[in-house]
A protein has these predicted regions:
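Intrinsically disordered, low-complexity basic tails and flexible linkers associated
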Residues: 1-86
């Protein structure tokens, strides 16, 4: 799978994530998919940082929340990815 293919399925990933864990969805719904290399998906939050005001969701994106996103990606796409942030 390449980044373009993953982007085409991203709304399905987010919909599944929202149905399972609304906190995880809030933490990731405004992420930008920056790159996909091997099994590593890099997410960028520049827009989220500009618009979040006093809310800092970075601390919310802990191992459990990140794992929920990784699980949703695997279920929708069939591939296992590690999530990193820039």
């Amino acid at each position: 799978m390449n980044l373009v293919e993953l982007k085409s399925k991203w709304n399905d990933v987010l919909d599944l994530l929202e149905s399972r864990d609304r906190i995880a969805w809030i933490a990731y719904f405004d992420a930008r998919l920056a790159s996909l290399s091997d099994d590593v998906l890099t997410l960028h939050f520049v827009d989220a940082e500009k618009l979040s005001g006093a809310h800092d969701y970075k601390a919310t994106r802990n191992d459990r929340i990140r794992g929920a996103l990784e699980d949703a990606i695997k279920e929708v796409t069939g591939i296992s990815l590690k999530i990193v942030e820039i």
